[in-house]
């Protein structure tokens, strides 16, 4: 049975949607025989309330999350999903290709609460796939 992986990240520009699509495709090319990727861009339509409910339902079905953490700070919705998934005991792998630091100090990738919720934060798609493979193998 395939494990469900929730792909979290901002979806407010074509560039963000294209990047999310690229991440999903890369993950599935390497691990598609073992996982199913749930991406809000493909499941969510309607009012803000319907979007919220469908995303929470999808999060509840997934034990693993990939969180896109690029930008001057983490997207608000992504940060909420990270916290929710962490509180439910899920494993979160962040990907941050943005070379700007967005945390409390020079060694922080992002906000301490988001960073502390992730089992790892990686900087490339190859490292993301490798980390997901380790989680699936454990």
What are these regions (language model features)?
Residues 1-138:
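Conserved catalytic or regulatory cores that recognize and/or transform ribose-phosphate-containing ligands
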């Amino acid at each position: 049975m395939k494990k469900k992986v929730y792909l979290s990240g901002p979806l407010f520009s074509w560039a963000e949607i294209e990047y999310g699509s690229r991440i999903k495709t890369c993950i599935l090319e390497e691990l598609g025989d073992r996982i199913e990727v749930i991406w809000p861009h493909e499941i969510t339509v309607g009012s803000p309330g319907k979007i919220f409910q469908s995303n929470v339902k999808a999060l509840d079905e997934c034990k693993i999350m990939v969180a896109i953490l690029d930008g001057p700070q983490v997207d608000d919705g992504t940060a909420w999903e990270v916290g929710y998934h962490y509180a439910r005991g899920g494993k979160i792998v962040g990907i941050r290709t943005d070379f700007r630091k967005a945390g409390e100090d020079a060694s922080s990738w992002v906000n301490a609460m988001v960073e502390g919720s992730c089992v790892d934060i990686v900087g490339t798609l190859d490292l993301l796939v490798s980390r997901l493979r380790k989680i699936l193998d454990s």
